[in-house]
Amino acid sequence: MQATPVFIHTPYIKLDQLLKLESIIETGGQIKFILDDYVVLVNGEECTQKRKKIYPGDVVSIEGVGSWQVVAEEAEE
């Protein structure tokens, strides 16, 4: 499965913010249900941290839901 790029303007994005940005969850509180019901992988390793910092180059995968790669958006000069 090809990872969908997620562009950020900050040094990192937290896992719950990433899933809200991608409309996987509507509120930050829903991350608990995702972590309880699905295996969430960050760079191939299982993640159970709601607010795990995800950096450019990191790949987040949720089986049956999708896969996303964080990309640093270049600042316009």
Give residue ranges: language-model regions.
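A detector for short, charged/polar N-terminal pre-domain segments
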Residues: 1-13
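Low-complexity, intrinsically disordered short peptide segments enriched in small/polar/basic residues
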Residues: 3-5, 37, 59-62
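Intrinsically disordered, low-complexity regions
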Residues: 4, 29, 45, 65-67
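Small beta-barrel nucleic-acid-binding modules, principally OB-folds
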Residues: 4, 17-18, 74
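A generic "binding-loop/recognition-motif" signal
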Residues: 11, 38, 66
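A basic, amphipathic helix-loop patch mediating RNA/tRNA/ribosome contacts
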Residues: 14-56
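C-terminal structural segments of small proteins and small subunits
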Residues: 49-77
